[in-house]
Amino acid sequence: MPEVPQTLEYLRTRHRLILVTKGAQAEQSGKIERSGLKEYFSATEIVAEKDSAVYHALAEKYELARESTWMIGNSPRSDINPALAAGLHAVFVPHGDTWILEHEEVNAAPAGQRLLILGRFAELREHF
């Protein structure tokens, strides 16, 4: 995705970034290393499943205030909907290469929460 390193560099100077991905530990660790993006994150978490319980647990682990924590992702099923269910805000950045099993309707944000839908990852700089 264009402008990802520049956008992450911008965001990390203003916010604490935590990478959360799901899958097999060895496979995901390798992908993170090969991406060259690990340096932009203060922590990385590889989980078996990304659901609201996991987001609750991570918010506790990292002492995140849910009212000011955002999940940014391209999967309604694993990123956006469970984050909203866990009381977080969410930014949906659709991507054409998102695995078909991750597709589902994006839920509306519950009262008191926000949902942004962006066309490009670089647009995050306009909001954060």
Q: At which residue positions do the language-model features occur?
A:
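Conserved phosphate-coupling serine/threonine residues in phosphotransfer and NTP-handling enzymes
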Residues: T21
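Asp-based, Mg2+/Mn2+-dependent phosphohydrolase catalytic module
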Residues: P5, E9, R16, A24-F128
